[in-house]
Amino acid sequence: GRNYAEHAIEMGHDPSKEPPFFFQKNPDNIVTDGKFPYPSQSSDVHHEIEMVVALAKGGDNIPVETALEHVFGYGVGLDMTRRDLQGEAKKAGRPWEVGKAFEASAPCGPLVPASEIGHPTSGAVTLKVNGEMRQQGDLNQLIWKVPEMISYLSGLFTLQPGDIIMTGTPAGVGAVVRGDVMEGFVEGIGKIEVVVV
């Protein structure tokens, strides 16, 4: 979390480089059918557009210098967030999973192999809702780069082939309602279109 400075600021945090904050979604949170069912437990669900990294091989204590050798490819994803429940968890000093790791909370587009596109380090990251631009950033604004994220994470957990890492979202997060159409794009990787149902 908080891997783009402007998003850190809009969420009330200091954007200076600090160890990244990670949370885990469940494997069944990932959906690819282009639909996001609005969760009944929340009244304030936000979009967060992100580049996702898919691992081809796992490991632990992976050096930064060899981290990219573990990457299969990249995709476009949405980290849908029950902002109201996340806020309550933060105030209580509890983990964020109640706001982040719920059913269908991680819509993802197709994965593109790194063997085809390399390892993107720059390129536009955008999200439109009903045709209106909401989020705009660039991969070159990532505070923690992909090799650093993989290395750091692998020091905390043993990573597995098939693991998906969401890399953070640029500024402009906001609420969606049923009927909204979200169009996410990461330059050089692809796009995703998701309807809130």
Short names for language-model regions:
Residues 3, 7-17, 75, 83-197:
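Catalytic-pocket segment enriched in acidic/His residues
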Residues 2-71:
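Extended, compositionally biased flexible segments
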